[in-house]
């Protein structure tokens, strides 16, 4: 077995250059880099604006393995006049407050959240406006709810209680109060990491009403709209992107069921949806497409708990009109075969899952096949350019995440009933005998000699360990491994052809691999206008041409030099 192991990706925003060139950007707008905004501060003297935001959770009901090692919160520094992004800083926790120092080129940032059971965690960051580097200056995690400069040396902060068990007893009112303190330093531009002690946060207790998230976001959106001088709203999560034969680009995104962009880069149509589309399957003739729409099992509307039905719709590619929808009793993930057969696998049953099959010209499922349980980390296996319908199935129906096999489903076997054929174990190394997660992939090779190239990860109780992410090429019939490439960060998307496999990671890195032998052609961290971006979806549209959908809602039309 030949293979290549490349070093881990890093979270530094100093990226190497590579051969990938962005030719045009669809869905671009100011403040894209920070996602959904949470707080805004403007400094007219410096001509800068600081924005805290949230890029969002990467998983959905059909694929959840790409959430590991993901930091979704951001602080962006922008110019007031040109709205160009100067710096982007990651945060481990939600960003509550940002404040420019009255004289020094720094910004103080307060972050944090409740861990759901005990502690109010967070940190105080100092961001250097000259270098873009950030320093966590407090020792120990503590949620910082608000901050403002009282003078050049004094920073007034409002912090949450350490935890919800003061004195060892649960306090149900802990979220209703906070403590205010003044931190003093002679030079805040030269404060060492971890030098602010927890006892410095001891101060006066006060009532503190945490604002509703919707109100916080609404105020921040209004502030950014005022800066742009026109209506503004965030874009996030381009979950799927594809190109039609006529050059149009079709995509689905957070809050967007589907949208179409003309070859000249102008938006042709857009169907809005509170949840948004997750998968696109373009039908033969390219007149319409199936869209898999994400729906939560239930949500609160005011004080009422509302249950939402799963949704898969068929839309016209001419105008985006919804032509019909499928009645479903479960959320699903879509898998398509090259000849047009479509499979819908149920995702919200851990033991009694099913597979529904739709003919290439069909309008609704005709057959259901028992396939066992599904969960988004273990069983996700979206294989593109495939001559078969591939899935992951657990040997033990009571514990379907264990001993998973790659199986294929024949929609029309000889006896007239759909057939599930067991192909080979997902785990190819009997000595390791690991618990493997699934991931995206493609089928390559000629007729009669087809191989699978797919991503995945080796599970460990300690979390995702370095080197436990993999991309592997395997015989489509027997599962024999031809090559393996390992990595440290989860795979968000994968596509390719007979020459090159392109793999996107949630670290922001894109890696090109020789399809034949697994050697790495090149690797490059994705940047847009000099700032980091994270690829979430990608499609090869031709030799050396890619469409990349980003976590921050942009679509990148790229070529490889």
Model-assigned labels for residue ranges:
Residues 28-64, 96-98, 230-255:
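Beta-strand-rich domains and repeat architectures in extracellular enzymes and scaffolds
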Residues 34-41, 91-100, 140-152, 194-209, ...:
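Repeated scaffold domains used in trafficking and secretory/extracellular systems
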Residues 49, 107, 155-156, 249, ...:
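Hydrophobic beta-strand positions that form the internal "hydrophobic ladder"
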Residues 54-56, 112-114, 160-163, 255, ...:
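Residue-level signature of beta-propeller blades and closely related beta-rich strand-turn architectures
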């Amino acid at each position: 077995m030949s293979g290549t192991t490349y070093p881990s990706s890093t979270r530094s925003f100093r990226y190497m250059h590579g051969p990938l060139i962005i030719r045009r950007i669809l869905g671009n707008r100011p403040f894209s880099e920070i996602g959904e905004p949470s707080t805004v501060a403007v400094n007219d003297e410096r001509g800068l604006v600081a924005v805290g935001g949230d890029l969002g959770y990467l998983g959905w009901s059909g694929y959840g393995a790409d959430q590991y090692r993901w930091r979704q919160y951001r602080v962006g520094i922008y110019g007031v006049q040109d709205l160009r992004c100067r710096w982007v800083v990651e945060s481990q926790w939600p960003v509550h407050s940002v404040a420019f120092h009255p004289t020094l080129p720094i910004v103080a940032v307060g972050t944090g959240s409740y861990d759901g059971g005990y502690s109010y965690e967070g940190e105080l960051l100092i961001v250097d406006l000259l270098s873009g580097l950030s320093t966590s200056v407090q020792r120990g995690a503590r949620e910082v709810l608000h901050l403002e400069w009282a003078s050049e040396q004094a920073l007034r902060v409002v912090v949450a209680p350490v935890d919800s068990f003061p004195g060892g007893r649960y306090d149900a009112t802990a979220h209703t109060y906070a403590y205010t303190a003044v931190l003093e330093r002679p030079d805040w531009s030269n404060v060492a990491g971890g030098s602010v002690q927890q006892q410095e946060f001891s101060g006066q207790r006060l009532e503190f009403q945490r604002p509703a998230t919707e109100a916080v976001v609404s105020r921040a959106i209004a502030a950014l709209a005022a800066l742009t001088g026109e209506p503004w709203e965030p874009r996030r999560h381009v979950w799927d992107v594809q190109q039609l034969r006529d050059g149009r680009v079709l995509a689905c995104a957070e809050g967007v069921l589907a949208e179409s962009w003309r070859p000249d880069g102008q938006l042709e149509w857009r169907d809005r949806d509170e949840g948004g589309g997750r998968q696109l399957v373009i039908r033969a003739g390219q007149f319409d497409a199936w869209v898999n729409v994400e729906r939560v099992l239930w949500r609160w509307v005011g004080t009422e708990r509302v249950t939402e039905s799963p949704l898969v719709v068929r839309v016209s590619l001419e105008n985006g009109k919804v032509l019909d929808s499928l009645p479903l009793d479960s959320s699903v993930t879509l898998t398509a075969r090259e000849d047009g057969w479509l499979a819908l696998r149920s995702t919200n049953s851990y033991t009694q899952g099913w597979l529904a099959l739709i003919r290439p010209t069909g309008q609704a499922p005709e057959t259901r096949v028992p396939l066992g349980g599904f969960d988004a980390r273990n069983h996700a296996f979206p294989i593109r350019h495939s001559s078969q319908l591939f899935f992951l199935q657990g040997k033990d129906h009571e514990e379907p995440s264990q001993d998973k096999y790659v199986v294929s489903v024949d929609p029309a076997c000889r006896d007239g009933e759909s057939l599930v054929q067991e192909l080979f174990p997902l785990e190819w190394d009997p000595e390791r005998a690991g618990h493997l997660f699934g991931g995206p992939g493609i089928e390559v090779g000629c007729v009669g000699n087809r191989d699978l190239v797919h991503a995945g990860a080796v599970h460990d109780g300690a979390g995702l360990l370095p080197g436990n992410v993999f991309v592997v090429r395997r015989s489509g019939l027997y599962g024999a491994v031809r090559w393996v490439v390992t990595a440290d960060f989860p795979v968000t998307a994968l596509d390719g052809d007979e020459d090159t496999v392109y793999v996107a990671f949630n670290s922001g890195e894109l890696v090109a691999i020789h399809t034949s032998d697994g050697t790495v052609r090149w690797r490059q961290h994705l940047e847009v206008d000099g700032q980091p971006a994270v690829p979430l979806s990608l499609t090869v549209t031709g030799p050396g041409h890619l469409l990349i959908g980003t976590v921050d809602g942009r679509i990148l039309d790229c070529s490889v030099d």
